[in-house]
Amino acid sequence: SMKGLLDFHRAHGKVGTIMVTRVEEPAKYGKSVVLSHETGLIDRFVEHGRTYHGNWINAGVYIFSPSIFERIALRPTSMEREVLPELAADDQLYSRQLDGFWMNVKKPREWIEGNALYLSHLRTERPAALLAAGGGDGGDGGSSSGGGSGGAPALGASSAVEGNVLMDASATVGDDCLIGPDVTIGPNCVIGSGVRLAHCVLLEGVKVGAHACVFDSILGWRATVGEWTRVEGVSVLGEDVHLGSEVCLNGALILPHKKLDTSVTTPQIIM
C-alpha cells in the first residue's frame, strides 16, 4: 500500500524509496534492480545482458524527500537513467516490494489488459463492487453498486452480465444488452437497448446507441456511438468524439472533438 511505502520511507530516512516488483521476464522491462533482500537498500541498476542479475524491476512508484531537488540538474534530466542510479551509488535509495498485481501500461492494448487484471483483482478482493452475473429485471438486475454511489446501477429487462463488469451507479443499461466480460462503465454513461460490450472501458458520460457493439476498445469522456455501429480492434475514441450510425471502426485512434460518419476498416489515426 502507499501508506506502507510512506512509512518505510520515513523509517529509513534516506532520500528515495521506489516500489519494485518481481517479473518472469525482466529483459522486457529494461534494467533489473540489484538490492539487499534484508534491508531493501538498492545497490545498482543493471542492463540485461548475458549475465543474470535477478527478476526485480522498477515498478514506477517513487517517494522522495525534499532534498531530491538538489540532485536534479537544471536541464532535461532522466529520473531512471540519471537520478536513480546516482542515488543508488550514494546508498540513498531503498526499495519496497509491491504487494499484489502489477502491469506495465503504455499502450491502449495494455490498458485494456490492465483493466481486465484489475477487475480480476476486484473479483477476489471486493466481489461486491462488481455487477452480479445474470440477467436484469428492469431494476438493479441483482447487482451491487458497482463502485459508484446512490444505489445499484440500472439494468434493463432481459439484459445480462457476463464475467467481470464494473459499472458506476449513475450509469444505465437498456433492454436486451449483453455486458462483459472485462468491462468498466464510468459515471453517467447511457447504454441503449440491444448493445453488446466486451473487453472495453467507457469513461464518464459515454453514450452508446441501440444495437451497437464495442469490443476491445476505449471510449473517452462524453464520446457517443451511433446505433448499429461497431467499434473493435483496439480502437480509441478521444474526448467528445461522435460516431454516426452504422459505422464500423477497426483499430482507429480518433483524436478529441471529432465527428465521424464513415467507416474506418484499417488501423489509423484520425486527426
Give the ranges of each region predicted by the language model.
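A short, polar/proline- and glycine-enriched secondary-structure boundary/capping micro-motif
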Residues: 53-57, 185, 237
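Glycine-rich hexapeptide-repeat left-handed beta-helix
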Residues: 142, 147, 193-271
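Residue-level recognition of oxygen-bearing side chains
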Residues: 1-4, 110, 196, 213
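Catalytic-core segments of class I nucleotidyltransferases/pyrophosphorylases
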Residues: 3-11, 23-27, 36-126
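Extended, small-residue-rich solenoid/repeat segments and analogous flexible loops
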Residues: 88-205
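Short loop/turn microsegments at loop-to-beta-strand junctions
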Residues: 29, 59, 162-163, 168, ...
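Generic beta-sheet signal
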Residues: 19-20
